Swiss-Prot record:
<feature type="signal peptide">
    <location>
        <begin position="1"/>
        <end position="21"/>
    </location>
</feature>
<dbReference type="Pfam" id="PF00419">
    <property type="entry name" value="Fimbrial"/>
</dbReference>
<keyword id="KW-1015">Disulfide bond</keyword>
<comment type="similarity">
    <text>Belongs to the fimbrial protein family.</text>
</comment>
<protein>
    <recommendedName>
        <fullName>KS71A fimbrillin</fullName>
    </recommendedName>
</protein>
<dbReference type="InterPro" id="IPR008966">
    <property type="entry name" value="Adhesion_dom_sf"/>
</dbReference>
<keyword id="KW-0732">Signal</keyword>
<dbReference type="GO" id="GO:0043709">
    <property type="term" value="P:cell adhesion involved in single-species biofilm formation"/>
</dbReference>
<dbReference type="InterPro" id="IPR036937">
    <property type="entry name" value="Adhesion_dom_fimbrial_sf"/>
</dbReference>
<comment type="function">
    <text>Fimbriae (also called pili), polar filaments radiating from the surface of the bacterium to a length of 0.5-1.5 micrometers and numbering 100-300 per cell, enable bacteria to colonize the epithelium of specific host organs.</text>
</comment>
<feature type="disulfide bond">
    <location>
        <begin position="43"/>
        <end position="82"/>
    </location>
</feature>
<dbReference type="GO" id="GO:0009289">
    <property type="term" value="C:pilus"/>
</dbReference>
<dbReference type="InterPro" id="IPR050263">
    <property type="entry name" value="Bact_Fimbrial_Adh_Pro"/>
</dbReference>
<dbReference type="InterPro" id="IPR000259">
    <property type="entry name" value="Adhesion_dom_fimbrial"/>
</dbReference>
<keyword id="KW-0281">Fimbrium</keyword>
Length: 187
């Protein structure tokens, strides 16, 4: 009888081990990659803000031809984890707030550095305006108005819209695209 009990215990251990071994077999797998960039700046740029895509959808050719402008789309640049302690300085006895301004670069439309030329032979252009409605220039040198910063997260607001370019040609059907780059300057 003792042999039967020992044999039963051994059999149970083997079955139990087999069940546990089967449960630990991977039933799916994946990979997580991590990346980033350390910058010498008071703020980081949120990933979604660093590379954005704005889709204007389908736009009526006749609407643009008659001087229409699409509904503005938000173009927000979110700055994260800002530490503006070193930006604040005494200037004339008063504390100066930390600020940021931007420059935009791209291919300006013909005779208009405040319009971004599109690619695609549609004779359209993109206009970007700051929060006060002032058009930004795509010359890579003209700074936008300075925005005050706080410690933590900050969002710089712009809008973008499409209109007929200044080429004098009729708006044509087809797909278009454009790329603008921005640079930050902290003060």
């Amino acid at each position: 009888m003792i042999k039967s009990v020992i044999a039963g215990a051994v059999a149970m251990a083997v079955v139990s081990f087999g069940a546990n071994a089967a449960a630990s077999i991977p039933q799916g797998q994946g990979e997580v990659s991590f990346k980033g960039t350390v910058v010498d700046a008071p703020c980081g740029i949120e990933t979604q803000s660093a590379k954005q895509e704005i889709d204007f959808g389908q736009i009526s050719k006749s609407f643009l031809q008659e001087g229409g402008e699409t509904q503005p789309k938000d173009l927000n640049i979110k700055l994260v984890n800002c530490d503006i302690t070193n930006l604040k300085q005494l200037q004339g006895g008063a504390a100066k707030k930390g600020t940021v301004s931007l420059t935009f670069s791209g291919v300006p439309a013909e005779n208009a550095d405040d319009m971004l030329q599109t690619v695609g032979d549609t004779n359209t252009a993109i206009v970007v305006t700051d929060s006060s409605g002032k058009r930004v220039k795509f010359d890579g040198a003209t700074e936008t108005g300075a925005s005050n910063l706080i410690n933590g997260d900050n969002t710089i607001h712009f809008t973008a819209f499409v209109k007929k370019d200044n080429s004098g040609k009729n708006v044509a059907e087809g797909a278009f695209s454009a790329v603008a780059n921005f640079n930050l300057t902290y003060q």
